Amino acid sequence: MRALRLVTSESVTEGHPDKLADRISDAILDALIAQDKKARVAAETLVTTGLVFVAGEITTEGYVDIPNLVRKTVREVGYTRAKYGFDADTCAVLTAIDEQSPDIAGGVNLSYEWRVLKSTDPLDRVGAGDQGLMFGYATDETPELMPLPITLAHRLTMRLAEVRKTGLLPYLRPDGKAQVTVVYEGDKPLYVKTVVVSAQHSPEVEQEQLREDLIREVVRQAIPPEYLKDGETEYLINPSGRFILGGPHADTGLTGRKIIVDTYGGAVPHGGGAFSGKDPTKVDRSASYYARYMAKNIVAAGLARRALVELAYAIGKARPVSLRVETFGTGVLPDEKLTEIAKKVFDPRPLAIIEELDLLRPIYTPTSAYGHFGRPGFPWEETDRVEALRREAGL
């Protein structure tokens, strides 16, 4: 028997203050990119008691009524009553928006390859919006080709929001969190060791009723029964006790503070760049999406059971300064060979990514909660490079 290990991941609901900030930032991005595909957007949001503050750098021919859009977004999430301590109709909305730095714009609009190397390749024209490293990952332990702990954590928070919105558990409020610890034997997930659910609620509900309801209607609906082991799985439901004050009234929220929730739950490294509120010339976002696309196709093609793709960029330069594939000993070919195959099949230049994944569309608000990866409907989740990868691998 191989040694057992524990892997833990967390998720938060759309009503968590950091996620509310992410959603507002992405709503602004979507509203602008729907009008102006060339919009350059870096929208940052802070939410606290009675206040939303939106700042950032935006260059666009479009126009968005930011205060009205903020209120609409807050209302959609569910902060609609003053007793929640944060209300869409009464919160103040402040803005401080500048244009994108002309120095940055110059390097993005006309890349190092065009300016210095005199390239005439159209896909070389747009440079990366910043330096940095980005990671994409896929694993065959779930149908979504995502790590099991983060997949289950997202299912819990999505279910928590669902039972609130449908009125099945009418005493729930928008804020909430979940955490899942999974027992692994080697790379194989065996069962869930610990489930943590913290749900904001009205003062009237008793803790015992809350516990029973959340185990029955949330945990057992979200986690497949084969992963819940009698006598082994521990259920920690609101382990701190009462959770009446929540959302921005209890904790200040900021865009970009849930980067591990947004990605792979800590299963692999993270380059540090956040996603929400950024247009796709920002490789923090678009290259992370493309790295996931690459990794998922490698696993879907049967070239590895686990694949990590690392990309790195220099600001103003179109071509990555590095590209690496790592398969943790699960690849059918050496990692060096898979890296060479990936370079032939994929094109991670910013403009190529934008065109291939069709990223100049208002598709970003749904990504702002419950993870950017492992959900259908996003172009970076497609597996349309499988045949090309298998051909290059000689399979």
UniProtKB/Swiss-Prot annotation:
E.C. number(s) listed in UniProt: 2.5.1.6
Cofactor binding annotation: Binds 2 divalent ions per subunit. Binds 1 potassium ion per subunit.
A GO BP annotation: S-adenosylmethionine biosynthetic process
Signal sequence range: none
Residue sites binding K(+) per the record: E44
Molecular-function GO term, any one: ATP binding
Family: Belongs to the AdoMet synthase family.
Name the record gives this protein: S-adenosylmethionine synthase
Protein species of origin: Thermus thermophilus (strain ATCC BAA-163 / DSM 7039 / HB27)
